[in-house]
Amino acid sequence: KAWFVLSMRAVGGLFVDLWTSVAKTVKGWL
């Protein structure tokens, strides 16, 4: 099940990158 953990980490990293970019955009608007 190592592939499952790795895939979850990859998805988590993508969400973190997406969230940080969204936060930067929102800060730019405010």
Swiss-Prot record:
It is an enzyme of class 3 (hydrolase). This is Alanine carboxypeptidase. Keywords: Carboxypeptidase, Hydrolase, Protease. Its EC number is 3.4.17.6. GO terms for biological process: proteolysis. It comes from Geobacillus stearothermophilus. It catalyses: Release of a C-terminal alanine from a peptide or a variety of pteroyl or acyl groups. The keyword Hydrolase applies. GO terms for molecular function: metallocarboxypeptidase activity.
